[in-house]
């Protein structure tokens, strides 16, 4: 029987603002739903749209656009200090309550989404059943250090061009943008040309970079925003649910970047996609979805016993 998607869109009131969300599948199916947290901060749900495929397994999938982005309320005049990890944690909890799933849910956070998901999971919410940090940093200083290492391995002149414009602050110079794209094509998304949903997200960031610039910076690898010193290392052992770490062989989230997840979380496993960079859900879509579904089916079963720290 062919799977027919049941799709519902709506808005969750978040104080004076609105959080747009979409549910693919049936929240009343009895199977643990998966909440997908997009990256950035400042991106949109579009580029992680592929995770809707998971709904065919019976796990409903919730996408949402974080405040300031996509179809949610935009606040371009807010001071950079407004945009905090705490704000986005509150928004996530508000969405879980709005959808009435706070007693039973799993989280998949991609890139920054995994950072936010880590902060959420560290607090040990009672309804969280599983956590999937996909291509996510654990320490921004390590992230930047690894990005600098990867930059130096790019074709001749690219790193020097990036460095020249970063020193001058000329981030909108066409030469800088072109050099940045070389890095992105190697370590962010290796599907060329970029799929429409990926291009749509980057276009949305360009149209309103408020959150991205405030918290991250002008590019993936030049982090000068409020997250520049963020880290979850030393705190990840508090995560007490089954965890699946996802990354790509060519990922800017290198093995060194994701290693603390593997070292600190008691019940953890790692899926490394050999033909992917930062977006295995796009670059190896079928294999990635299969891995996620297999994990959810295993650990969200009533028979599963969570591994504890020894």
Swiss-Prot record:
PANTHER family: HYDROLASE, PUTATIVE (AFU_ORTHOLOGUE AFUA_2G14860)-RELATED, MONOACYLGLYCEROL LIPASE. One of its GO terms (biological process) is proteolysis. This is L-amino acid amidase. InterPro entries: AB_hydrolase_1 (IPR000073), AB_hydrolase_fold (IPR029058), AB_hydrolase_sf (IPR050266), Peptidase_S33 (IPR002410), Pro_imino_pep (IPR005945). It comes from the Bacteria. Hydrolyzes L-prolinamide, L-proline-p-nitroanilide, L-alaninamide, L-methioninamide, piperidine-2-carboxamide and piperazine-2-carboxamide. Has a much lower activity towards piperazine-2-tert-butylcarboxamide. Does not hydrolyze dipeptides and D-prolinamide. Its EC number is 3.5.1.101. Optimum temperature is 45 degrees Celsius, activity decreases rapidly above 45 degrees Celsius possibly due to instability at higher temperatures. Inactivated following 5 minutes incubation at 55 degrees Celsius, and only retains 25% of activity after 5 minutes incubation at 50 degrees Celsius. It catalyses: (S)-piperazine-2-carboxamide + H2O = (S)-piperazine-2-carboxylate + NH4(+); L-prolinamide + H2O = L-proline + NH4(+).
């Amino acid at each position: 029987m062919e799977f027919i998607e049941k799709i519902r869109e709506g808005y969750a009131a978040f104080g004076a603002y609105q959080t747009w969300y979409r549910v693919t599948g049936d929240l009343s199916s009895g199977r643990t739903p998966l909440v997908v947290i997009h990256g950035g901060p400042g991106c949109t749900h579009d580029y992680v749209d592929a995770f809707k495929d998971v709904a065919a397994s019976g796990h409903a999938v919730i996408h949402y656009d974080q405040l300031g982005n996509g179809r949610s309320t935009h606040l371009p005049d807010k001071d950079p200090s407004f945009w905090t990890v705490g704000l986005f944690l509150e928004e996530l909890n508000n969405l879980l309550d709005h959808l009435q799933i706070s007693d039973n849910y799993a989280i998949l956070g991609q890139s920054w989404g995994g950072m936010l998901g880590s902060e959420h999971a560290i607090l040990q919410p009672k309804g969280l059943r599983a956590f999937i940090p996909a291509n996510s940093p654990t320490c921004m200083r390590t992230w930047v250090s690894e990005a600098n290492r990867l930059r130096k391995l790019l074709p001749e002149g690219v790193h020097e061009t990036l460095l020249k414009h970063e020193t001058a602050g000329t981030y909108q110079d066409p030469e800088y943008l072109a050099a940045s794209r070389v890095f992105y094509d190697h370590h962010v998304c290796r599907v060329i040309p970029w799929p429409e949903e990926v291009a749509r997200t980057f276009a949305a960031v360009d149209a309103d970079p408020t959150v991205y610039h405030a918290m991250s910076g002008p590019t993936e690898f030049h982090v000068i925003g409020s997250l520049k010193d963020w880290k979850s290392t030393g705190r990840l052992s508090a995560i007490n649910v089954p965890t699946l770490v996802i990354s790509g062989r060519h990922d800017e989230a290198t093995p060194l970047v994701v290693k603390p997840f593997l070292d600190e979380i008691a019940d953890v496993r790692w899926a490394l996609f050999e033909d992917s960079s930062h977006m295995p859900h796009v670059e190896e879509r079928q294999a990635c979805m299969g891995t996620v579904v297999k994990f959810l089916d295993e650990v969200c079963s009533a028979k599963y016993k969570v591994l504890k720290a020894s």
